[in-house]
Amino acid sequence: MSKHKKLNVAVIGATGYTGLDLVLMLSKHPYVKINSLCATKNLGKKISFFDKRIKKKLPKVTSINKIKWDNLDLIFLSLPNGEAQKLIKKKFYKNKKLKFIDLSADFRIINPKIYKKNYNINHKAIKLIKYSLYSVPEL
């Protein structure tokens, strides 16, 4: 049996509907180690408080400010539209080896004018759109 390195991940927006489903799936993946679960409310609570299906012992919910970015390989963003682009813009230029998977609409539409028309939000990270890839992984 070969040994695989575990991927160190964070889930930002972990206590929302999509975030909880993602945490459940990641908690069962043999090659994923969840290092951080982040939200803006209910800090310090166990993730199982929000979803009883999550049985694995995981880090307690914390704020984004507590993330140790250098210890991560991948960040999942399950945030409202308009929020992921701000965070990615801020963090991408500081650590270009970080990979982000955004579950919102922020990098779904590559034309900023169409994005604005659909979501009534000005895109704040236009230069980063070229680094993004949108797909529907059917989580």
Question: How does the language model describe each region?
Answer:
Residues 1-139:
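N-terminal Rossmann-like NAD(P) cofactor-binding subdomain of oxidoreductases
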